[in-house]
């Protein structure tokens, strides 16, 4: 088993890995819209979604996977009004991949967080 970290302070504080690879599977924890290099959070949901997807792509690459290997995605948004706003980012990232997907409207742990995306990838 391989554990992957992005160095986010949340990983150490909350005791989790950004991703865990086991066999042909890669489980990527929920990723919020921070630019984890600067810890800056954009205000707009679309910008947050794009940051989430960029972080996910980087994590998958470091694990030996790619976006094309994603088989499941869960989106968590704090406001259903943000759904339309993030659709362009989702269509660009997943339009050709078409993983199984769930979208949930729920609160997140910080008030500035509008979007969280979690994925599972498989190479078999």
What is the predicted function of each stretch?
Residues 1-71, 77-124:
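N-terminal presequence-like segments and the immediate start of the first folded domain
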